[in-house]
Amino acid sequence: MAAAKTPVIVVPVIDRLPSETFPNVHEHINDQKFDDVKDNEVMPEKRNVVVVKDDPDHYKDYAFIQWTGGNIRNDDKYTHFFSGFCNTMCTEETKRNIARHLALWDSNFFTELENKKVEYVVIVENDNVIEDITFLRPVLKAMHDKKIDILQMREIITGNKVKTELVMDKNHAIFTYTGGYDVSLSAYIIRVTTELNIVDEIIKSGGLSSGFYFEIARIENEMKINRQILDNAAKYVEHDPRLVAEHRFENMKPNFWSRIGTAATKRYPGVMYAFTTPLISFFGLFDINVIGLIVILFIMFMLIFNVKSKLLWFLTGTFVTAFI
């Protein structure tokens, strides 16, 4: 018995080879490489083949692909994914990352997958690492059996959860819980028809506003989409915040603070990732991240209390030029 290969799609958010996201792929398939697919392209025919059921080599279940479309820096045709407000006030990084996913969902590639009756795709941003993919086969089967539309493989909120058994066998004990507003596009498995329906609804509604994750959750509720979140997701998908934090510092203007930040990222990756997270765009002129917001609040404090220290004003000025 045979079935169509499930696409495993790597979405680039940093400068990194897709094989680093799946470091063991070449050990299993000698001629395996990641085919690049961009706008207006479909899956290469040589990868669109069938696999034998229960093949002991799990890597042969999948067609490994790197998505290179949706680059808003090179093309303005993706502006319809965002409302006028978001096109002005959403940060460059937010629009860039979201556009890559929405352009993928709205691409000929996914229309072709629907025509060929491919049920699910696995999508992973390249700041993640999945060393062992053997959990995917039973997870995909369980998603089909339990009518799960989306399995999010990165947890945003920690705390007490009502967990449901997804897979229980001799190799895996996997649980999930129902998602709410804790939406992440970092790594997920999604039904092809669900993707097409979501992106169609986004476009018809005039594009996303600044509250992207709230809007996705709203659409899920309206369309009765079953999104589950993988419990203990870091066990299966390792997200490295250092990679994105370093990428952000590398794209800053070279200065003393950017070098300090790059060094601090190696020791405190989670903290620096949070501090460099962009929050809002100032009418498309520049983006303000967490550090920038702190600097703005500090400037307001100094103005209110009439601080006259030249050293403090000098240091604040260097922060402004570095982070705002």
UniProtKB/Swiss-Prot annotation:
Protein name: Envelope protein OPG108
Transmembrane portions of the chain: 285-305
GO cellular component, one term: viral envelope
Source organism (scientific name): Vaccinia virus (strain Western Reserve) (VACV)
Induction: Expressed in the late phase of the viral replicative cycle.
Taxonomic lineage of the native organism: Viruses, Varidnaviria, Bamfordvirae, Nucleocytoviricota, Pokkesviricetes
Miscellaneous comment text of the record: Immunodominant protein.
UniProtKB keywords: Host-virus interaction, Late protein, Membrane, Signal-anchor, Transmembrane, Transmembrane helix, Viral attachment to host cell, Viral envelope protein, Virion, Virus entry into host cell
Disruption phenotype: Impaired virion assembly.
Subcellular location: Virion membrane
Cleaved signal peptide residues: none
Role of this protein: Envelope protein that binds to heparan sulfate on the cell surface and might provide virion attachment to target cell.
Post-translational changes noted in the entry: Does not contain disulfide bonds.
Membrane topology: Single-pass membrane protein
